[in-house]
């Protein structure tokens, strides 16, 4: 793999991991249509996930620091973060159960381009209707256990290529009456255990040995980190300004175009 190839894949991973357009769907489409493209190796996949996870940690460093110290501080803010930590754990449970139980099915779906195209259309529908029906919703302090559980199920469903993780989790929280900024923030914090879990699974599949391409892979990871930071910042602004419609249209166009090509 060349440096350019690694940087382009890192850019793709960082942008599509957090923007509501499905990173897995774009990776599958790239594999089908880009000449000479092949699925990256396990180590490269691990480093890309590490780059995007670092982007969340840096962007939400205040939240992450307080979550880490929530059970060591007695004041009221720590109590709020202890509650948020419990909600994140609740959201992670269905993701882990469904993801591990149906892993082979989701892996098989990666090669079904018509299905991926339809799932992109579904993602567009979720974004459109959640934006259209949203109201001034509940803040983080009013998130409920049921909200977290439903968001976790949505995140699990997003393992299906073409379904956006951020798009589906933000959409279901908007449908549940959560404010846009709170929904996006909770969605990104939910990504940490999900991405960490995906990284751990990849590590378990990593054959022994050190790759000579580590400097190339590291370049891809750095690009995933930088583009991940940019995409998080962009999506937070889009949600605040109620402009998810733009991503809905993008998903519809991509899904429709590639469904027509692959059918």
Curated annotation (Swiss-Prot):
Signal peptide: none annotated. The chain crosses the membrane at residues 40-60, 87-107, 109-129, 186-206, 219-239, 243-263. Pfam families: BacA. The keyword Hydrolase applies. GO terms for molecular function: undecaprenyl-diphosphatase activity. Keywords: Antibiotic resistance, Cell inner membrane, Cell membrane, Cell shape, Cell wall biogenesis/degradation, Hydrolase, Membrane, Peptidoglycan synthesis, Transmembrane, Transmembrane helix. The keyword Phosphoprotein does not apply. One of its GO terms (cellular component) is plasma membrane. It catalyses: di-trans,octa-cis-undecaprenyl diphosphate + H2O = di-trans,octa-cis-undecaprenyl phosphate + phosphate + H(+). InterPro entries: UppP (IPR003824). It is found in: Cell inner membrane. GO terms for biological process: cell wall organization; peptidoglycan biosynthetic process; regulation of cell shape; response to antibiotic. Its EC number is 3.6.1.27. It is a multi-pass membrane protein. Coiled coil: none annotated. Belongs to the UppP family. Catalyzes the dephosphorylation of undecaprenyl diphosphate (UPP). Confers resistance to bacitracin. PANTHER family: UNDECAPRENYL-DIPHOSPHATASE. Bacitracin is thought to be involved in the inhibition of peptidoglycan synthesis by sequestering undecaprenyl diphosphate, thereby reducing the pool of lipid carrier available. This is Undecaprenyl-diphosphatase.
